[in-house]
């Protein structure tokens, strides 16, 4: 359901006749201006579970909230230290992306690669897990095969060993598991992604001007 209200809202109340027959997926209270962002956090997910969301439900979401851009960022927990073969992951994520395309036909889709993830070698040195680099190659292929945009977050972070640099930054921008960024790190990477998107838009506008 969608309700439009003019002016300021002080409070909102919903009343249902039977609680057992009512299911709330969420609440959005957006204005008519600016950028609207919905964040669907699926912690620990590889992104393959998106295939299981019924098409009818997603299409109903699209009727109420027709997205311009869908950003996918999964895979950190898929990577293993020496992982080389991610064929099943590639096949599954391609299916998930096609599923989203069918349900949100107007939306562009951007796939973010996994970031750096470090481990300690036998000599005690911090190095990027080889499996991370292999997974990123698979993710690049996924984006190319499905015809969607791709952003290499690993390279944006600084490439090889960059997670350790974020951990040891002052103040720190990542956790001492050398896997997860913190809020400061998230803000830092968000700024880099924003700059990339704006630069891409500027280049697109310049090309269009010469057509």
Model feature map: region roles:
Residues 1-92, 180:
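Conserved SGNH/GDSL esterase-like catalytic core that processes O-acyl groups on lipids
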Residues 35-36, 65-70, 104-109, 145-149:
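Loop/turn elements at helix/coil->beta-strand transitions in domains of secreted/extracellular proteins
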Residues 40, 72-73, 112, 135, ...:
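Generic beta-strand/beta-sheet core signal
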Residues 55, 116-211:
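Catalytic His-Asp segment of secreted/periplasmic serine-dependent ester chemistry enzymes
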Residues 59-61, 99-100, 196:
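A generic secondary-structure signal
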Residues 69-75, 94-102, 108-113, 117:
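Conserved, well-ordered alpha-helix/loop/beta-strand core segments that scaffold catalytic motifs
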Residues 88-91, 95-102, 134-141:
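Alpha-helical scaffolding segments of alpha/beta enzyme cores, especially the outer helices
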């Amino acid at each position: 359901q969608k309700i439009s209200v003019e002016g300021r809202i002080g409070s909102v109340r919903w009343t249902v006749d039977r609680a057992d027959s009512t299911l709330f997926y969420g609440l959005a209270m957006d204005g008519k201006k600016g950028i609207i962002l919905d964040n669907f956090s699926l912690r620990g997910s590889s992104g393959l579970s998106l295939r299981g969301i019924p098409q009818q439900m997603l299409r109903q979401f699209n009727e109420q909230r027709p997205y311009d851009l869908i950003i996918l960022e999964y895979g950190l927990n898929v990577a293993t230290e020496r992982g080389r073969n991610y064929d099943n992951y590639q096949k599954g994520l391609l299916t998930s992306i096609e599923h989203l395309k069918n349900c949100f036909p107007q939306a562009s889709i951007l796939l973010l690669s996994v970031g750096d993830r470090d481990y300690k070698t036998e000599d005690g040195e911090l190095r990027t897990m080889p499996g991370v680099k292999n997974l990123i190659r698979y993710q690049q292929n996924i984006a190319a095969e499905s015809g969607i945009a791709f952003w290499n977050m690993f390279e944006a972070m600084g490439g090889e060993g960059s997670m350790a640099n974020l951990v040891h930054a002052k103040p720190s921008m990542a956790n001492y598991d050398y896997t997860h960024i913190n809020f400061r790190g998230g803000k830092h990477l968000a700024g880099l992604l924003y700059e990339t998107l704006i630069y891409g838009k500027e280049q697109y506008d310049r090309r269009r001007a010469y057509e």
